[in-house]
């Protein structure tokens, strides 16, 4: 792919991610949501034809956004783990996880279709999140802040539970409180 084409592709993915973040806010306010490819193209400052050249379907674009945002979330973990005490760093990263989940809600039925088709797998997502959580736990155990008997996979399962068990009318606030409880439960 030529450099200019790769740059435009990245612009489209970034614009779609930003649009989904805006839609997640709208969804929390009860507004109807649906990703508009015209709005994504305008936000990316490319023509609709350019968008479709790189992403022939809405699902292809959303899959690229999903993978990019998951990579960004997971890649941020080691640096964040090294930048603050383990409990504070892990909670800050968990809040980023909430942002990731919020933007996925805006994908709605499209995300369900991608999971059903196998384009996105829960196993891969969970494995990547588990790998990302490990540095926080290792740093916390080494500092005497966290218990040593909790595997990263259990933390990921509890994070998902906190998000999906929260009352829809207070989704973000309750999820944040549940994640703070999870941090308290990890303490030595």
Regions found by a protein language model. Give the residues of each.
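Basic, helix-initiating cap at the start of DNA-binding domains
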Residues: 1-43, 60
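Amphipathic alpha-helical segments that line or abut small-molecule/effector binding pockets
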Residues: 14, 87-102, 131, 135, ...
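Short hydrophobic/aromatic patch on the recognition helix
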Residues: 45-55
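Short amphipathic alpha-helical segment with a characteristic S/N-K-E followed by hydrophobic residues
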Residues: 57-62, 73
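Short secondary-structure transition hinges
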Residues: 60, 98-135, 160-168
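Hydrophobic alpha-helical connector segments
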Residues: 64, 77-103, 121
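All-alpha amphipathic helical-bundle segments outside canonical DNA-binding/catalytic cores
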Residues: 124-128, 142-157, 169-174
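C-terminal peripheral helix-coil segments that are non-catalytic and often amphipathic
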Residues: 131, 135-143, 161, 165-188
């Amino acid at each position: 792919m030529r450099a200019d084409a790769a740059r435009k592709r990245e612009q489209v993915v970034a614009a779609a991610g930003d649009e989904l973040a805006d839609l997640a806010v709208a969804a929390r306010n009860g507004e109807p949501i649906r990703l508009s490819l015209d709005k994504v193209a305008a936000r990316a400052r490319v023509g609709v034809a350019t968008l479709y050249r790189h992403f022939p379907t809405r699902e292809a674009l959303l899959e690229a956004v999903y993978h990019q945002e998951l990579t960004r979330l997971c890649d941020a973990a080691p640096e964040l783990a090294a930048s603050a005490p383990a409990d504070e760093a892990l909670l800050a990263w968990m809040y980023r996880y909430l942002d990731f989940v919020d933007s996925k809600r805006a994908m709605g039925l499209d995300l369900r279709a991608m999971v059903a088709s196998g384009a996105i797998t829960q196993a891969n997502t969970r494995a990547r999140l588990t790998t990302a959580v490990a540095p926080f736990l290792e740093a916390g155990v080494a500092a005497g802040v966290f218990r040593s008997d909790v595997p990263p996979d259990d933390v990921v399962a509890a994070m998902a539970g906190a998000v999906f068990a929260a009352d829809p009318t207070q989704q973000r606030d309750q999820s944040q409180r549940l994640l703070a409880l999870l941090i308290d439960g990890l303490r030595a």
